[in-house]
């Protein structure tokens, strides 16, 4: 991979030109038709109409200022169109995908600029036809007027199409099948989508590198956030996939910390979780940096445990692997590490049976990445905690309680239970993109609020020794991993390990 590094004096940000062979994908048409056909395959029908409205232009409440636009991801998936007030229809029987775009009056151009024309949309997106939304109602009325109109598939009842002219809808609507079908289609990425996530990771990795180069000169968490945004914007990405997390000291123990306004002085570490979007596709990267340029003994010990957790878990990624098993391996390594430090104590078997390590590693190992940073998981969850009615869903960050972890461990070791769980648990497939993000956290409120008074766990924790680790805060390391035919590829190129320490201490070139 080659980089061209350019200083942009206007905002003192690193401009990154990443040259890869796969970047040509971003210059081709968005594969809308491919994605629509994937959806129909999962839908399992040979006739009908898929109707998806895009995000309308909406003003802030009691204001004439617009809300920050974010395209509806299901609509985007089968069109690639990233502007307001559009819609999409796909006629299943005729394999015809139509993008409906708004007509922009000249006076609107004066105030707000133009939007892509119908001809431009045809060049950008692999759709069969581009028409104006002013014609959509008449199209739908003709569809409804058929002697036996096919079913119209919509995501939600409140997205039923408007036939206009006060007509009562004669459409046969189904809002139960499309969403799960689209989730199953989205969970395995097309090559185009992989290229988009790769590009987002390249830019975000450059942002993390730039923070590492400057970290010894920074004084406040907000400076970290500013650098990340500047680097991403300078490289063409104006949108972060999620709010930037820059938690120093005890703030690093808050999983979704967002204030980003605390001074860095006197802290051991800072957890930086940040990833931008490229063409609506997300990245998700976390690095933990020593603020002095070297690890304190306590932070070094925790970082070593988390680093091993991530390295070994990434090595286990491959087609046919159950995510539950990788998560359990991470939890086992975390438990062994904390037992070695004396933070956890007691017989290994007893600690494992209780699941007490979840007090320190309280979230799932990872999630899908795509059009959402916590992307859809299809129909099956990554892991299922039997008896809890709660799933460790790839698409949403979920709390992993000790009892859930204990149930997962028991099901994995019991042949009968494992068979049931295997049918409930998602196996990794080629072209899935997942994060591997183990972490160990010392959140005083969480630990003392739930575990100190719980006899099932209190005796397995050395509370006096734990006091010496609260100032570490937390350590998390996260990369985006592409599942390949024969294993995996790490899409994240942000420095970590010894390379990260070298970057920190060498500073800016």
From Swiss-Prot:
Sorted keywords for this record are: Aminopeptidase, Hydrolase, Manganese, Metal-binding, Metalloprotease, Protease
Looking at the record's lineage, which domain of life comes first?
Eukaryota
What is the E.C. number? Answer: 3.4.11.9
Give the reactions, separated by semicolons, that this protein catalyses.
Release of any N-terminal amino acid, including proline, that is linked to proline, even from a dipeptide or tripeptide
Q: Record-annotated residues binding Mn(2+) 2? A: 273, 284, 478
UniProt lists the family membership as follows:
Belongs to the peptidase M24B family.
Q: What is this protein called?
A: Probable Xaa-Pro aminopeptidase MAC_04092
Species of origin reads: Metarhizium acridum (strain CQMa 102)
